[in-house]
């Protein structure tokens, strides 16, 4: 049905699919897996006209800490998120992924500049690590040119 209707698939991931925090290995691993699945699924479904998007929220007010504590059989919450920002922006991103004419592949949704900055810096750090110390390393000018080409295809900020 999804192929026949040229529908949409939207998966909730996390910035933890890009970042890997201390003491969060299993959670980060699961989010990295969702990222890989979303990327593969998007490529697989592209020829069928099905759009696939990942929504990657940062830290918002949610029950994730309480839910994890219950699953582990403890009454102590792992993270009190009651003072965090409401997840309305995450819901808005899901709506865009499902209903805008040309959805983005990724919707990183963070509650503040800091979370956006550390996520982008981590992605850049991984790029640098991938590029160093092998026979096909690119120089700075080539990397900047590649980045400029990628930025030329990016959508403007809303």
Each PLM stretch: what is its role?
Residues 1-6:
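A short helix-coil junction within the Rossmann-fold of NAD(P)-dependent oxidoreductases
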Residues 14:
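Residue(s) in the substrate-gating loop at a strand-loop-helix junction
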Residues 19, 40-51:
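Active-site-adjacent segment of SDR/Rossmann-fold oxidoreductases
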Residues 19-25:
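Active-site loop immediately N-terminal to the catalytic Tyr-X3-Lys motif
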Residues 30-33:
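Active-site helix of classical SDR
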Residues 47-104:
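SDR active-site lid
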Residues 85, 106-117:
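Short-chain dehydrogenase/reductase
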